[in-house]
Amino acid sequence: MTDKSTTRIALRGKLDSLNAQIVFLQAVSQNPEYISDLEDVRQIVRTLQMCEASDEVFEESFSLWGMSEDEIHSRSHNPAKFFGKGHILPHHDMQKESAGLNLLRTQIREVELCACSAFEESDYLRLCHVLNRLSSAVYILTYKFLPEEYNHQLNFHSERRNTGNEQIQV
């Protein structure tokens, strides 16, 4: 029996909570496309749960919505190029689906940190990488469900302008 205070048990709990959060977001949505996209994410989380519980390494690469892991990384780091908007500055104007995805993205990041702590210097570091890409994929998905007029963004390369857009100069 595993000691309940180990980082592995903490990781299992976080993965379980992550799966529950996805199911909750699906349950409260009326949007079939949103529900389906979240199911794709949930399937990866379930695979990670099974791999962790059975001491198997998640070795395979994955793709979501026709994007490879490298494409997910590129799009999440260059949203203006791919989505015509800068990095998202969360705000209640983003509406329910996007706000839910933003919350989910942050929860995936928390699970990633827990996984990295649980599996320092081991073959299981792939799990950390998959979680990193999964949070990036959810970030990309957020753009799909943002209202067209949403204009709250982090602006890394331009001066702050007083145009009614909420921007933060970084």
Spell out what each predicted region is.
Residues M1-V170:
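Phosphate/pyrophosphate-binding loop motifs in nucleotide- or prenyl diphosphate-using proteins
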